[in-house]
Amino acid sequence: MRTSFDVIVIGGGHAGCEAAAAAARIGAATALVTHRFATVGAMSCNPAIGGLGKGHLVREVDALDGLMGRVADAGGIQFRMLNRRKGPAVRGPRAQADRKLYAAAMQIAIQGFPNLSVIEGEADALLWQDGRVSGIRLGDGREFAAAAVVITTGTFLRGLIHLGERSWPAGRIDEAPAMGLSSSFEALGFKLGRLKTGTPPRLDGRTIDWSAVEMQPGDDPAEPFSVLTPAITTPQIECGITRTTPATHEVIRANVHRSPMYSGQIQSTGPRYCPSIEDKIVKFGDRDGHQIFLEPEGLDDPTVYPNGISTSLPEEVQRAILKTIPGLERTEMLRPGYAIEYDHVDPRELEPTLQTKRLRGLFLAGQINGTTGYEEAAAQGLVAGLNAALSAGGGDRAVFDRADGYLGVMIDDLVTRGITEPYRMFTSRAEYRLTLRADNADQRLTDKGLALGCVGVERSAFHHDKMAALSDAKALAQSLSITPNEAAKHGLALNRDGQRRSAFDLLSYPEIEWAQVRAIWPELGKVDPAIAVHVEIDAKYHVYLERQTADVEAFRRDESLGLTDVDYAAVPGLSNEARTRLERHRPHTVGQAGRLDGITPAALGILAAYLRREQRKRKSTG
């Protein structure tokens, strides 16, 4: 077996799979280290991909030729576009997935890279020399050399499961944790913290009274995540919706002292936006019910995931809770819910490439950086894998900023501000939402992926054809024009100002849709419907996009002012507080400095003026 690689990726979850695949696409000799190949691509918690903000990340991973979108399309059994009634900028594609189909599709994808080897075993220690990573050691003593290592351990890093009064070391239920790597991090001086997450009990769907719950169908037709998926062919299912009751809340209140979160057994912080059911009852006790989504875990699997009742209460209490919920009174619990604590690294220890500042060649992605969610992990994995391969090969860095995409927003939030709780992506975190839409991820990022060398031949050809078709369709819509009087004959009420308006102009009106302009100009009928959607969205947002483009240009000017080698003690006019914060965090740019707490606009002005003076000095002496 080969013992030396360009890149080694530790962990076969969503971050690890994307990291290994990204490194392999760049051409790096890559190894993926995992306890068992059978668990690669496993969905540890909810059987779903995407959602608000998260769906944007999946589309961005797909735009860079990542795996998650295509794998979700292969395993998806219910697709829904969330926020469909709102504007395109905040719509979120989501898919319920068959766990077995998803994992199988991911494993096939991983096996499809000839330069990607899978090594089964537990990574026990990092190896390094002269400030740079040199490889890893497994628990069985085997050593593997590498120019770059990506760690994506998820909840396995010194993982500890809690169920009622019991607790035991584990990375997932019935799977061993990764214990040795934490010692390596501590030996290197990394600041480690503890976070917590949880999962609900699993139910036998054959024992649920489906007639007592509301049924929720998916979209028809289903809209795929990946632009390379022509249509969804997997059979589609419905999900159920029920609610907790006052009786449920009484059971929880009577036993909340037995919850590890409230007994003092768990001290770490859990995800704010995915609270346990006991947290909901304690913090929102005035509500008469909390919604529960009953999500089947597979087409041929009776297991149902009750989304909304994550808990670590004792098993007998969980059974008592289920008996109080409509439709679940006689359900059989296949596996209890539980909470899990795990180590994470302070993400402020990272560069925007996700390389650590302390050890060159070491990259981190996923929950180890303090995030929560499959999609957040996948996006980080892709960025870390790209940069690990580029680092190993002596290439340029792959950095995505806040105007590039949600993956840039997330990484900047992490490395600039750090975290106090598990980080989850929302559309509200992005300043440039109008340009960072789920529908245009490929238009924003695929060209950048092509330049980096991570986009394959199939996507490259598809992207070229799509962009040409979009350009032609937009040009056609802009070339066709009509007067207000002529428009009135077609039922369109425009201001009678005598000005001709193009089809593109008409589409900018909120009440005018593509079908109406196509009825006026039959030649628009030759435009592919998928392309027409993009033209209409671009028209609707046209004026706002022009304004946001100016904002992005100003942002990029600040991002171009580098601070890497600045001696803040030599910058006159800075307050002691600003100087201390800048020294502590060492931001890369003036833009990043502005996103630190306590750095005022005045301090930014002083920094910008100082940099301009230094630049003039270098030019005059150069």
From Swiss-Prot:
Cofactor section: FAD
Keywords: Cytoplasm, FAD, Flavoprotein, NAD, tRNA processing
Keyword Flavoprotein: yes
Gene Ontology CC: cytosol
Positions of FAD binding: 11-16
Principal location class: cytoplasm
Keyword flag Transferase: no
A GO molecular function held by the record: flavin adenine dinucleotide binding
Subcellular location: Cytoplasm
Binding site for NAD(+): 270-284
InterPro entries according to UniProt: FAD/NAD-bd_sf, GIDA_C_N, MnmG, MnmG-rel, MnmG-rel_CS, MnmG_C, MnmG_C_subdom, MnmG_C_subdom_sf
GO biological-process terms attached to the record: tRNA methylation; tRNA wobble uridine modification
Membrane-crossing residue ranges in chain numbering: none
HAMAP family documented for this protein: MnmG_GidA
Family to which the UniProt record says this protein belongs: Belongs to the MnmG family.
Subunit record text: Homodimer. Heterotetramer of two MnmE and two MnmG subunits.
UniProt function note: NAD-binding protein involved in the addition of a carboxymethylaminomethyl (cmnm) group at the wobble position (U34) of certain tRNAs, forming tRNA-cmnm(5)s(2)U34.
Name of the molecule in the record: tRNA uridine 5-carboxymethylaminomethyl modification enzyme MnmG
